[in-house]
């Protein structure tokens, strides 16, 4: 495989990695970014078509396919990236997902086998640095620092939470139960889960972002780069079922979700 220029942009969440990838892609004549979530791919697609002729922008996920005949820029879930496209720029977001038990093989395949003709950008956490170095390619590392500081504020009852707050739960049943409790006590909450249809998810995000409701209840998937205007993030539990067992969240997972 031809050696390729790689830029690895590493840092915690909320450090502008995705923004940098978008701006870099748009500086090339063609490009593609693979995201970990359908909702994030859609969010970036909506932002880009506000800047670029929509006829030049494609969205490809497991649920949505908008592919203009003259598309130059592709926003995809990692699984849906068209690997046969010859594009100047390729970006892969949340590259640390290579270690994920369920989806890691897909991220690893993209890490090893998909390249931009002029630049490949890998965005993710510092835990990936040694692995990226082992690719033995022409690699530049950019370290990103968090824009905002996370601080622990302790426990709070739902009746006492402030507006612009998200509560993270780890099952659909719990998400709906918490949202119903907030509706009774606070007047309403938006819900964001990967299992919702694209139309419903987008409507729920808009409901919160427009200020129609002041609270958000979501699964931990919201930590994968989805940008929401939040002041506080609470966890309904610090344990989650990882597909094999119920276990405690580690500090990096807490930072990823809350950040």
Write out the residue ranges for each language-model feature.
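Walker A/P-loop
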Residues: 2-20, 133-135
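Inter-Walker segment of RecA-like/P-loop motor cores
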Residues: 48-86
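Conserved interdomain hinge at the start of the Helicase C-terminal
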Residues: 20-25, 102, 106, 112-114, ...
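Conserved RecA-like helicase motor core of SF1/SF2 enzymes
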Residues: 185-188, 193-198, 202-259
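Post-DEXD/H (motif II) to motif III coupling segment of the RecA-like Helicase ATP-binding lobe
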Residues: 31, 96-151
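Conserved RecA-like helicase motor-core motifs
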Residues: 52-63, 142, 185-198
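Conserved strand-helix element at the start of the C-terminal RecA-like helicase core
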Residues: 29-44, 120-123, 160-185, 189-193
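Walker B catalytic acidic pair
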Residues: 78, 93-95, 237
């Amino acid at each position: 495989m031809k050696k390729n220029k790689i830029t690895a942009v590493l840092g915690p969440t909320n450090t502008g990695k995705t923004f940098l990838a978008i701006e870099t892609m748009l500086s090339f004549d063609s490009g593609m970014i693979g995201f970990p979530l359908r909702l994030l791919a859609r969010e970036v697609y909506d932002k880009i078509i506000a800047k670029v002729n929509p006829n030049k922008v494609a969205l490809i996920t497991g649920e949505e396919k908008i592919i203009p005949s003259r598309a130059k820029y592709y926003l995809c879930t990692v699984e849906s990236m068209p690997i046969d496209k010859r594009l100047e720029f390729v970006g892969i977001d949340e590259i640390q997902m290579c270690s994920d038990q369920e989806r890691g093989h897909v991220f690893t395949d993209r890490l090893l086998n998909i390249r931009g003709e002029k630049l490949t950008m890998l965005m993710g956490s510092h835990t990936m640095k040694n692995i990226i170095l082992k690719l033995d390619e022409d690699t530049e590392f950019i370290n990103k620092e968090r824009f905002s500081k996370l601080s622990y504020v302790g426990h709070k009852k739902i009746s006492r939470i402030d507006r612009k707050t998200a509560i993270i739960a780890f099952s659909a049943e719990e998400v709906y139960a918490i949202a119903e409790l907030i509706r009774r006590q606070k007047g309403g909450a938006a819900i964001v889960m990967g299992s919702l249809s694209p139309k419903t998810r987008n409507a729920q995000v808009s409901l919160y972002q427009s200020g129609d409701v002041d609270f958000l209840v979501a699964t931990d998937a919201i930590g994968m780069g989805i940008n929401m205007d939040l002041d506080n993030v609470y966890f309904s539990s610090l344990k989650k079922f990882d597909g094999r067992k119920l276990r405690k969240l580690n500090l990096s997972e807490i930072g990823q979700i809350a950040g």
